[in-house]
C-alpha cells in the first residue's frame, strides 16, 4: 500500500472531524450559551444530575434568560422570560408530542408510531372526561372512597405525612378512575402494589433517559406493573358500560383498541403513573403548609366549621356549593403547587426558532422551569412566602389561574386531569381536617432537588399526629 493510499482515509477522517468541530462551534456561536462539559455524550450530565433544580438556577444567573445544557446526549435549551415563554407555548416550530415520545417509550414501552396515532385522541378523551363540565360526577364517589379510607385510620395515630396521603389517595383514585378493588384486594397485595409503584415512580425520571440495565429494581417494578395490567385487562374492560357508568380507564382502552390490542397494558401503566404520581405530593405539601401556618390553619378550620359544623364524627357529604364556600382550601392547594411546581415542562424544536438574539436549532428540547418561574418576584411578589390570599386575584369561577402559573403546563397540552386532581385534594383536605385534630411532629422538609419531572417529593420525613375530634 502506498503512502498516499494510507494518507487519504486518514486525511478524510481528520477533515471530517474538523468540519464537525467547526459546525458545532458555529452552532454554539449562533445559539444560546452552552454548558456542555468535556465527556462525550454525557456532557454536563454528572454535575447536572446531582441537583438539577439548583444547576438550572445557577446557570440562569450566570448566563441569562436563555441558555443550553448538553447532558446525556440531549441539548436542553432553557427559557425564563416572556419572549422565550411565548415561543415555547405558542410557536408552530415546537412540538409537545415529539418531546415526550422517547420518555413514553422508555417508561412504558409504547412505540412512537402507536403513541403518535393515539395521542391527540386520548388527550381529547381525558380532557373531556375529567374537565370542568364533568368533575361533579366524581365528587360523590371520591367522598365515599375517602370516608372508607379514613375509617381505616382509626380514632388517633401517628404516621409519616407522605404515607398518610398515599394511604388515602391511592385507593380513592384507583377505585374511582380504574375499578373498585382492582388491585387492592387484601393487605398483602396492597403492600406489594404500593412498594412496586413507589419504586417505579421514584425511578421514573431516570428510567425515561437511561438504559434499563442500569436501573434493575426500577425495571423489575415496571415489568411487575405491566404484568398486573395484562392480567387484569379483561376485568377492567368488563366493568361498567358506555357513558358515565364506565371508568376513565375503560374509555381509554376502548380508544386504544381501535388501533392496537397489544399495548393496552402499557397505556394502563401510563394512566396509573399520571393518576398517582402528582396528586399525593400536592396533598402532602398542602397539608404541610396549612399545619405549618397557625393563622391559615385556624382560618381553614373556621371555614370548614361554618359549612359542616364543628363535630368530627359525622360522615359528611360534600356538594359543589360546599366547595364554592371553601375557596380558601383551593387557594391553599394552588399556592402549595406554586411553591412546589414541577422542575420542567418541555417541547421539541422541529424548526429553528429565534429567542432574543439567539437561534435555537431544531432537535433541541426547549424547556421552562415552572419551579423557578414561580419564584420570579416580577410575576409573584414575595415568591418564597406561602400566601394563599394571592389567589383572590385569579378568576377561578371561570377556571383561570394567575398569569405565569405553569404548574399544570401551558398552551395546548396542559395536564388533562388537573381539575380532577384539584377536586380530590380539596375533598381530602376537607374530610381530614373535619374529622381530625392534626399537627406536625417535625418541621416541614425542603423539596428534593434531584428530580425535574412532576411535583417534587419532600427531601426528608415529616410525621403527622391525628386525633378524632370530640
Swiss-Prot record:
Subcellular locations according to the entry: Endoplasmic reticulum membrane; Microsome membrane
Pfam families cross-referenced by the UniProt entry: p450
Superkingdom: Eukaryota
Membrane topology type: Multi-pass membrane protein
InterPro entries tied to this protein: CYP450_sterol_14alpha_dmase, Cyt_P450, Cyt_P450_CYP7A1-type, Cyt_P450_E_grp-IV, Cyt_P450_sf
Chemical reaction(s) catalysed: (24S)-hydroxycholesterol + reduced [NADPH--hemoprotein reductase] + O2 = (24S)-7alpha-dihydroxycholesterol + oxidized [NADPH--hemoprotein reductase] + H2O + H(+)
Protein EC: 1.14.14.26
Family: Belongs to the cytochrome P450 family.
Protein name: 24-hydroxycholesterol 7-alpha-hydroxylase
Species classification: Eukaryota, Metazoa, Chordata, Craniata, Vertebrata
Amino acid at each position: 500500500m502506498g503512502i498516499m493510499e494510507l494518507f487519504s482515509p486518514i486525511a478524510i477522517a481528520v477533515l471530517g472531524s474538523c468540519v464537525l468541530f467547526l459546525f458545532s462551534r458555529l452552532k454554539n456561536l449562533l445559539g444560546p450559551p452552552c454548558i456542555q462539559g468535556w465527556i462525550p455524550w454525557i456532557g454536563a450530565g454528572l454535575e447536572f444530575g446531582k441537583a438539577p433544580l439548583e444547576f438550572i438556577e445557577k446557570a440562569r444567573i450566570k448566563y441569562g434568560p436563555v441558555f443550553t445544557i448538553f447532558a446525556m446526549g440531549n441539548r436542553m435549551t432553557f427559557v425564563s422570560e416572556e419572549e422565550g415563554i411565548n415561543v415555547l407555548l405558542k410557536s408552530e416550530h415546537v412540538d409537545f408530542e415529539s418531546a415526550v415520545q422517547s420518555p413514553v417509550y422508555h417508561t412504558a414501552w409504547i412505540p412512537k408510531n402507536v403513541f403518535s396515532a393515539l395521542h391527540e385522541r386520548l388527550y381529547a378523551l381525558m380532557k373531556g372526561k375529567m374537565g370542568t363540565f364533568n368533575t361533579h360526577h366524581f365528587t360523590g364517589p371520591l367522598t365515599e372512597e375517602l370516608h372508607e379510607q379514613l375509617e381505616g385510620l382509626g380514632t388517633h395515630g401517628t404516621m409519616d405525612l407522605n404515607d398518610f396521603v398515599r394511604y388515602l389517595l391511592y385507593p380513592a383514585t384507583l377505585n374511582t378512575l380504574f375499578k373498585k378493588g382492582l388491585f387492592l384486594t387484601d393487605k398483602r397485595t396492597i403492600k406489594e402494589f404500593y412498594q412496586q409503584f413507589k419504586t417505579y415512580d421514584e425511578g421514573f425520571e431516570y428510567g425515561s433517559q437511561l438504559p434499563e440495565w442500569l436501573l434493575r429494581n426500577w425495571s423489575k417494578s415496571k415489568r411487575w406493573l405491566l404484568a398486573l395490567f395484562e392480567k387484569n385487562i379483561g376485568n377492567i374492560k368488563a366493568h361498567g358500560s358506555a357513558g358515565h357508568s364506565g371508568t376513565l380507564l375503560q374509555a381509554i382502552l376502548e380508544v386504544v383498541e381501535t388501533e392496537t390490542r397489544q399495548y393496552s397494558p402499557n397505556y394502563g401503566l401510563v394512566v396509573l403513573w399520571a393518576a398517582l404520581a402528582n396528586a399525593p405530593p400536592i396533598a402532602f405539601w398542602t397539608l404541610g403548609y396549612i399545619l405549618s401556618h397557625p393563622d391559615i390553619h385556624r382560618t381553614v378550620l373556621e371555614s370548614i366549621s361554618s359549612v359542616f359544623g364543628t363535630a368530627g364524627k359525622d360522615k359528611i357529604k360534600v356538594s359543589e356549593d360546599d366547595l364554592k364556600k371553601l375557596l380558601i382550601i383551593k387557594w391553599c392547594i394552588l399556592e402549595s403547587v406554586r411553591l412546589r411546581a414541577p422542575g420542567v415542562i418541555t417541547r421539541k424544536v422541529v424548526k429553528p426558532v429565534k429567542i432574543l438574539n439567539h437561534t435555537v436549532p431544531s432537535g433541541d428540547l426547549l424547556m421552562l422551569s415552572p419551579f423557578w418561574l414561580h419564584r420570579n418576584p416580577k410575576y409573584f411578589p414575595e415568591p418564597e412566602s406561602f400566601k394563599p390570599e394571592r389567589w383572590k386575584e385569579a378568576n377561578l369561577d371561570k377556571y383561570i389561574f394567575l398569569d405565569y402559573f405553569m404548574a399544570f403546563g401551558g398552551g395546548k397540552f396542559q395536564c388533562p386531569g388537573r381539575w380532577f386532581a384539584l377536586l380530590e385534594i380539596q375533598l381530602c383536605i376537607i374530610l381530614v381536617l373535619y374529622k381530625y385534630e392534626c399537627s406536625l411532629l417535625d418541621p416541614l422538609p425542603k423539596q428534593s432537588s434531584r428530580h425535574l419531572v412532576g411535583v417534587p417529593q419532600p427531601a426528608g420525613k415529616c410525621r403527622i399526629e391525628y386525633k378524632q375530634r370530640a
